[in-house]
């Protein structure tokens, strides 16, 4: 059943890859890829897995092209940016602070596919209010991304605003 369902979806995903996707469409596309990756992990058909890996490789290449074409416009504010990690606290968490109990669980380096694998375990203890794929900053290295998340600034902004506290990765 999984094989035939993926074969049908494979064609639709392939058509999407041939089109020009915006950030929201890329997020939806990635969520579908993660779904199928986890589904195909449960079957023994290595041929289907190979086909999926080829499609995923093509998607990664096209997504890299998309990021190259758009990232600077997003961080420079010249184009409407998707939700990014350095604006997440301001946009999604701060509005709830002081109004209701709020907890934020940050797991460094957690990809969406890894989240989907542990989500069933955590859902026994926590209620998920919202789920959204967000774009990281570049580079995605912990030193930069984690600081950007908590500061609400890009690394260059942190360095300008807090010059005595900021250290480049090479300085540590």
Can you name each region flagged by the protein language model?
Residues 1-102, 109-172:
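…; additionally, a secondary subgroup of soluble metalloenzymes is captured
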